[in-house]
Structures are given as structure tokens and as C-alpha cells.
């Protein structure tokens, strides 16, 4: 949520008129704020990476056109985050009739109760101020979502008080009417039952509410946003065609197309309890991208960005665990910590039916490919020949859960006048013992994958040697 400034002090309709306030339709409000930010050179979409040239321009055009929007994409593509960011285009504070059920504008009451109050109290009608964070409402669609949840129902308590069933004031409004003058976002839209989709259809197109056989016309001012899986959002899927037709913009999302964007998302979203060097984040990002390209993985389910994020958090936790057990002053993740991530992340991937029993083999192969690609990318031009020669002469370097960064560095063989280590550490920006040990492990693992050195793993310890 955004950091709020203090709300205005105006407290009555009369004061609001005197201040020159004008009521503005929701879509005009969003359009004006978006245009103002674009003209000022500001970024209306903070924290979104990889959509700058694809999704965001489409969203901006849809908002300028005043369209309801549905985002189509696989899981973990940032659809929900993008929907939430749209709320940042609302005015920070907006006036509402104090105590009004539907956050009505003081100049434009729409319910019978608010109209009566406005007529009776005139300029002395009390107002309050609503922050934009309160004007965004989100609902995860599930098959058991009811019309009462989204649209409303008759309130039996009000009927018991003596009001008739046809009295509009007997209605307990649902999520969409309560989002009047705001944004309602529905995730996984096709999961709604067909009768709920029909009810939404009336609200979006006709702006009327049908409850228990009678119709209440309300000039609702709501921007409807939704997300859906592309497979479900078709005439053959679980979406009714008339509702599909009501969304002015269907926008396809995607996973980050550039490696740098994938790393940036992970760095931004992961809650890391220890330092994770950039080269490890790159490995995890490449690992995720390899999974998305693998024929062994069910691509209909996708490989979420949350996979990379969870991997980074697990790697950091492994480093912190080692630092605590070995009484290290700093916790820095190394190549050895990737094994812990693979062990716990496999369950997040759905494999094709013919891959039963090969899941771990596939994960290990794709991770090694990611490491090799990262080594080629980051260490290109560094001559590791002296290190290979030292290992061929019998040197060994041990690492593992029980091995500290200092132990790894002490085990590195002396290379005479060769500046291999200095060049390696400088290339990766490694200054502390932990960062240097992580850099050394990356180089050793790269040499192993290139079949320049050997590697033996047993009992929680890995030894690089002949």
C-alpha cells in the first residue's frame, strides 16, 4: 500500500463546494492521473519489470480508453501485482458522504438513504475522506462464490424490522456495488459459476442490480479488472461469451523475456535472510527459464516467478543455517546451497506424464545447465588454467554445509604469480570472505561442468580435485 499524506480537513458539502471541488467520473479520474504522470516523466508502474515494451503500453491505452480489463496469463506472471498497481492512478483522497454504504460522492448520491440525507441536510451534510487504498477491492473467484458475495442479497434483519421485500433499503450490497467509485479486481474469473457471470454481466453493461426478482437501477461507477488462465478464457472454456464481450481489453501477460528482468523481480520480491550474490540469482533465473523451455515440464501449468523467489529465499536460509552452526560472522550463499533449493522446490513443478521417476534427474540437469551458462556469461575471459593445473597436481578444495567460507579460501591452492583469484573476485565484486568463497565455488563448479576438474560428493561434503 502507498504511504498516505494527511486527509483534507473539509468536513461538509458546503465547504467542499466553496473549495471549488468538482465530481469526476472514475475513468476520467484515472485517465487524467495517468496522463499527468506520463507528461511529467514519472513511472506509473513502480516495481514491474519486463513489461515496459509489451504489456504496460496496452494497459495504458485501455485505461485511457476507459475500458474494463482482463489479463490473460499463466500463474506467476505478475497479473495480480499489475492490477493492484492500477489503484495507484486514483486520486489519493476522495470525498464521500459520511456513513454512506456505497462511498457515494457528496454531489452525486445514488442510494435512497443518501438522497434523503442530501435533501434534508443540504450544505451541512457531513463528508469524510477515503484513501485510494480503500477504493481497490480484490476477490479470488471460487466455484462457491455466490451472487450475494458479488452483487448482494436481501437482508432478513431489515425485512424483520418491517420493511417490504421490494424496498431498496432491504438490500445488503455485495462486493461490486460496494466498490462504487473504485476498482474491483476478480482473480481467476472463469472459476465463477455461470449464474454469477450473468449477474456480473448486468452490472457491467446495464448498471442495474437484480436481486430476488426485482431490479434496482444504480448508476454504479466501477472499473472491473480481472485475471484468467488463457485456456479457461475461451468460448470452449468456462467463461460465458456475453461476459467475455463486455471487457474492452484482453491483454496477454508473459514471463520476463529478458534475464535481467527475471533477476530484478527476484531481487525485489524475495525476503532474503542472508546475502545472496548476484551470480546465484542469475543461476536461479536461468534455472527457471530452462524449466519453462523444457519438454519434460507441463507448460500449461507454467513455472511461476515465485519459483525463482522461493529458490532465492531457500538458498539464503541454507547460508544462514550454515553460518549459525559454524559460528560464522556473516552468512553468504554459495553454490553448495543450491542443492537445498532443488530438494524443496521440485514439488512446485508439474512434469509431463511420461516423466514419472525422472523428476530429480531433470531438475539436476537443468540446474547444471544454468550454472554452466552463468559461468560462461560472467567469467568469460578469465584464464582459470593455473587453478586447473594446481588441482591436477593434487590440490583439493572441500566445501559443504559444514565448511565455512574461511575454510574454502584457505583450501584454495597457491597459484604463484598468477592473478586468477584477484581477477575472479574483482569480476564478481567479491570483497568479504563469504563473497570470495562464493566466487571461488562458482569457478570450481564451472571447471567441473566443463570436465576440467573432478568432483566427489558424500556425507554432506563436496570435494573438487582430480
Set out the residue ranges of the language-model regions.
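Conserved C-terminal "switch" segment of AAA+ ATPases
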Residues: 5-10, 19-33, 233-238, 244-301, ...
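Dynamic helix-loop-helix/coil hinge segments at AAA+ ATPase domain boundaries and subdomain interfaces
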Residues: 17-25, 36-55
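Phosphate-binding P-loop
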Residues: 51-52, 60-66, 74-75, 176-179, ...
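Short hydrophobic/aromatic beta-strand immediately N-terminal to the Walker A/P-loop
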Residues: 69-72, 185
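Conserved glycine(s) of the Walker
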Residues: 78-79
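Hydrophobic positions on the alpha1 helix immediately C-terminal to the Walker A/P-loop
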Residues: 82, 86
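Canonical AAA+ ATPase core
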Residues: 90-128, 132-175, 180-273, 317-326
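C-terminal engagement/docking regions of AAA+ P-loop ATPases
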Residues: 300, 320-466
